Amino acid sequence: MENKHNFMETESITKLLIKFSIPAIVGMFVNALYNVVDRIYIGNIKDIGHLGITGIGVVFPVVILIFSFSLLIGIGSAAAVSLKLGMKDREEAERFLGVAVFLSFIISVVLMLLIYFCMDKIIYFIGGSDKTFIYAKDYLFYINLGVPAAILGLVLNSVIRSDGSPKIAMGTLLLGAITNIVLDPIFIFAFGMGVKGAAIATIISQYISMFWTIYYFTSNKSKIKLIKKNIEFNFYKAKEICLLGSSAFAIQLGFSLVTYILNTVLKKYGGDTSIGAMAIVQSFMTFMAMPIFGINQGIQPILGYNYGAEKYKRVKEALYKGIFAATIICIIGYTSVRLFSSSLIKIFTTNLELEEITRYGLKAYTLVFPIVGFQIVSSIYFQAVGKPKMSFFISLSRQIIVMIPCLIILPIFFGLNGIWYAAPTADSIATLITYILVKKEIKKLDKLEEKLEKRNI
């Protein structure tokens, strides 16, 4: 086991980043297709496409909520496994894997029951109207049946990367996404199921991915094994998993809360069409942000393993190169939106009113997108090295501490335009806060490196 993971200490950081991040980027990029492809197909349903895409936009906070719990357990357990493997403790890593599976099951059951019994109230509470209710409910009912697959599949796939198999993790996401892309037009158009068909295609894809990840950890393919006796509740391990996953959880939970508030203020200042426009804008944001989360998925085991092995110089190098790569991706996304926004929006809708609002909103929402990568990668750094509280604060700084006040205050003075410009305002302030914290952390790493050198003399 030790020999299999020694390359994490000796291989060049650039090669490791490519090995782990490229598959993760491709995987997360493809994973974004789950929601984006649904919206593209639904938006092109004759006569009701604009209402269908608005209905999906209404329930999007719930979809994000489900995803946030999968990240809480997935990123947390992956970080714990990486740290234990860095310490050469395989058995403890396997125990964390078992606890992660147990937590995934319990959380899935609780979420499914809550959503099922409160579905109608939830839809109206998060921005549904009489026009969009039927489409929102059709989608959410079936998506709710896929909660166990959505959570456990992503949790196990996150740990696959920490197990040293990033290509297999990428393949898992590709399997699900390609299945979804193939099934969507069949269920939506061929079977005439519309919005229901999109949701059914999605959950079938998620269950296929989930069963594959279970097979991986019970076969000879994996280095650490999913053992039945380890699938149990352990308070201390559950606490550590949740602490280590709290940053990613906060980002997505905050995103869910922000999306709910967005739906509320959009309904007040712009009506159903504005909610539909935001659904399309968020599709682009998801598509552009997922590669950055892919870098996070890839860099996390590199940071965690080398920090656990006291290779602080390599930790700093990985952080710098991760930030650089994320920034390049952000710049590409920013440029694409400004050059090709009209053509890209037409993929989702041919409704002229919806298209016009979306075009303006997309350019405003992504105004400072090039700086977003720095904050996201910095957050995963603190999480990977076992400092979840700092990571949690960085995540909250953008999603809660700054963004929500902007969404409440700016529309009072600027109406609908204030809603669109809330995101770049929050990103600018949060990035400044993150820069100050990262600068202090780098100084601490320098001191740890000096102590290590003196100890080895």
Say what each PLM segment does.
Residues K19-D38, Y142, G176, S205-S209, ...:
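Transmembrane helical elements of multi-pass membrane transporters/channels
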Residues E9-I48, P61-G76, A80, F105-M112, ...:
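N-terminal transmembrane alpha-helices
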Residues F29-L33, I75-S77, S108-L113, I151, ...:
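Hydrophobic positions within alpha-helical transmembrane segments of bacterial inner-membrane proteins
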Residues A24, M28, I40, A79, ...:
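Transmembrane alpha-helix boundary and packing residues in multipass membrane permease domains
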